[in-house]
């Protein structure tokens, strides 16, 4: 394991960073706008989730950056709205969408740093412009199936109509 890529800085996505980094030596990656979130999760939130605090990011990324792992290249798509630094990662017909786009749903925007308008704009401009057969791999399985496609989300996602 070379990298631990956080699609955003919420505790349910970063709480494994410390153990994973310790066990593997992998570098932690997050968007520059969410970097502070890794090291500033309130103690109460950590306690609620029985989570560990995260080490600081080793690498920060921005829109258009490429993360290379062996022969795989992941293109960073800045998809804010769930958090200011939310990212999706695109590679060869697959997109990891974190908590931005779910199967027939979208991420919540009522937490600090969230914005419905910003998220919908990011989804429309960065994700729905990908090829329709692009496989959507969300950060949580909140739909009736674990994955989807961009074409399916365009047609069936009630939040994007």
Name what the model sees in each region.
Residues 1-69, 155:
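Active-site HxH/HxHxD metal-binding segment of metal-dependent hydrolases
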Residues 42-45, 51, 73-78, 83-161:
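Metallo-beta-lactamase
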């Amino acid at each position: 394991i070379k990298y631990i890529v956080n699609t955003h800085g919420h505790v349910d996505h970063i709480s494994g960073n410390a153990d994973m980094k310790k066990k593997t030596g992998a570098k932690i990656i997050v968007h520059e706008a969410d970097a502070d979130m890794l090291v500033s999760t309130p103690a109460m939130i950590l306690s609620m989730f029985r989570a560990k605090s995260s080490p600081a990011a080793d690498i920060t990324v921005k829109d258009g950056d490429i993360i290379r792992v062996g022969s795989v290249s992941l293109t960073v798509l800045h998809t804010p709205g769930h958090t200011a630094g939310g990212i999706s990662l695109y590679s060869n017909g697959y997109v990891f969408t974190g908590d931005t786009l779910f199967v027939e749903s979208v991420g919540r925007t009522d937490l600090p740093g969230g914005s419905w308008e910003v998220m919908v704009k990011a989804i429309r401009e960065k994700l729905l412009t990908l090829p329709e057969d692009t496989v959507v791999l969300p950060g949580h399985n909140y739909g009736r199936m674990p994955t989807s496609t961009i074409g399916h989300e365009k047609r069936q996602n009630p939040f994007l109509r």
